[in-house]
Swiss-Prot record:
Family to which this protein belongs: Belongs to the TRAFAC class translation factor GTPase superfamily. Classic translation factor GTPase family. IF-2 subfamily.
Residue span of region G4: 477-480
tr-type G domain sequence ranges: 368-537
Binding site for GTP: 377-384, 423-427, 477-480
Highest taxon above the source species: Bacteria
Name this polypeptide is given: Translation initiation factor IF-2
Annotated spans, G5: 513-515
Amino acid sequence: MADVTVKQLAQVVGIPVERLLNQLQEAGLSFTDDQQTVNEEQKRILLNHLKGSSNRDISAAPERITLRRKSMSQVTVGHDMHSGKTVNIEVRKKKTFIKRSAIPEQAEVEEPVVPPVVEEPVHEEITVVSDVSAETPELKETEEHPVIEPVAELDETVKEEEKINLEENTAESQDELAHANTDVIENLVDVVEETIPVSKKEEVKPEKVSKKKHLEQTDTDISEFKKGKKKPKYHTFEHDEEEQELHRRGGRSKFKKKKGTEKSDKYREAEETLTHGFALPTAPIVREVLIPETITVAELAKRMSVKAAEVIKVMMSLGAMATINQVIDQETSVIVVEEMGHKPVIIKEDAVETGLGEAISKGTKTEGRAPVVTIMGHVDHGKTSLLDYIRRTKVAAGEAGGITQHIGAYHVSTPKGNITFLDTPGHAAFTAMRARGAQATDIVILIVAADDGVKPQTIEAIQHAKAAKVPIIVAINKMDKPDADPERVMNELSVQEVIPEAWGGDTMFVNISAKSGMGIDDLLDAILLQSEVLELKAVTDGAAKGVVIESRLDKGRGPVATVLVQSGTLHKGDILLAGFQYGRVRALVSDNGDLVDSAGPSIPVEVLGLSAIPHAGDEAVVVPDEKKAREVALFRQGRFRDVKLARRQKTTIEGIMENMTATESKVLNIVLKADVQGSLEAISDALTKLSTDEVKVEVISSGVGGITESDVHLAIASNAILIGFNVRADGTAKRLAEQESVSIHYYSVIYDIVDQIKGALTGMLAPQFKEEIIGIAEVRDVFKSPKIGAIAGCMVIEGVVKRNNPIRVLRSNVVIYEGTLESLRRFKDDVLEVRQGFECGIGVKNYNDVKPGDLIEVFETVEIKRDL
């Protein structure tokens, strides 16, 4: 190899340049700059220097080396290997090697010692008995060794093996000390194209280890060996004490105490203070039993310190059947506790809720707020179209089927003031959604079409508004149509106790047209006038409080809740508690889709960051910290579960009979997924109402969001119909549905779902059959036939007699036989049918007692199409 610079050599060797310069100077070579050239001779000098330093390090090895080894094994404890218990055993061994030069050669000076006579072999434990007993108390491994001979009689083989092992282990211990030099040497060997022989380590055989057990002890032990003494067993007092503590169970110890040994002060004090005995109670114990809203029978028995069977006996004597894990309500628990002679103490579990109200910061600054107006009315009467004209948007055109199917919240700024509108669905299935809209509003605008009049949902909207004690403003829409009749609308509304101001009532009526914009300004004036009368005010500087209008699961943003703030100000970063869910507000989105930092009273916003989808209608409130929010949310979830369990039907005879009847009916299982919580609730209620005594609809799973693989698996397992309302299935769910031949039904209009499920239920109804008489024949005479038997010669007096149809034989208007018409002939010819006014011969199958004057009634069974 050509001469290289110091820098290049350092790169080849793999060490820093400064370190290589120091090593060159230590080797006696004058190198001060990394650009100086190094020839082959100088490389060899450096290599020899590094080899010498490595050997010096090895020669400076310590006189004593300790090796530690660890082995793992398993032992089955028990009589049977299949039923026994498997125990993991870890054995740790420790070996100490000493240089021969460190051991004083006393064997040559001392007189030879005669080996002691040993009658039986000595079992010697491993050197690390104390370590094993202290660290692995389960089992202790022992080895059997031959009788230990004096050190003077050790043969040369053992000495040679010891020397080899000592050198090997010495080399191992010096690996780290000479690691740097070794790396440099190996790299330099590659550079100068020389090889350094590397000795391979050999594993120590178990036989060698067992022969040198006596050399693993200290110098004192070796001197005792030379005197002919046996190696003692190393059970020190400290290790015995540790082992005794680890193995003790129930006060038992592996090592017995000597008799007469006095007990320690700890045990003496325990014996003096603890006295075992039973004192018979002289009077009945009356306990104060804390009773929450719901409690299980087992927990109630535990609080009274009695067995659950006694509580069940008392409940049965009171006429209520219960099981040990059944949840009973507070009233029943009080009766049972009083019956058993204890004192019930009713506790209110809403302490957490009360504490929440106290923890919420209340503001003091009160300002006027915009009115919250809910637009209600019958479907297709123009609610969304009116709102579109006010907002100058086209929401209705983009809605499926042209109908609203979830609540929309909008904040509108008009020249006359700000107004918050809630647009509710008008379909009959959205009753609960309209009720929520009425509860969260200040004014209700009742839309009635001038050409259609008052409809069922119009009446329902009036009832919701009256229940919420909210003023109503009637807007008579579609006044631009030629057949508009506002007087008819006023007459029909007066029947529902909605009297216009023109007739002496207190309800404002405004004629409008959402299409042309006629009367819209008058309607806005009426809204603002009504809001001034109400004097709407709200606190603006406290913790925000509002109501969840709608909620849904967004694929990219997670749970999204539309919250209408009613008081306070909701800020980004607040901890929001909504029903059973909570979370930190990550973002606030206005009704226009813009990100905002805060929202004041009467402002609807979409909230991102909740843990899950809250229920529409839940109260939303800002809490001081996340710990409080989690505590209240978990409490509400637990209470909801307990109440749900307590509402389970009690085991009664009537309930058993109803359940038996229910098992006979057919069930249509449905897995339902929708885009928002309100639509999900409305569809589920509408489908459940389709159930009858014969067929039932059971929504076994419902959720907000797309159709997933787990939904398809559930539909397969339960043989259910999979319905997606304004949602789609992901790729995995689609592939699984195709493989398992599961059809996924997509809908965007609630009418279509109801119609198709109604059709499916109709097909599940048991068929209904009706018997229709198609012909009557009068027997005039009877003939005998050798093949068939009696043949009735008849005259068809009504309808048509057909062959192979079921018949009845009537005598004096009493049915005497029911069978099948086997043979039908006319003039010795077989015919299929004979009409009224013709004669024929009729042979009745398996019946020969036909007499003149009898009537043969021919009928057929017709299936009647059933409907729900």
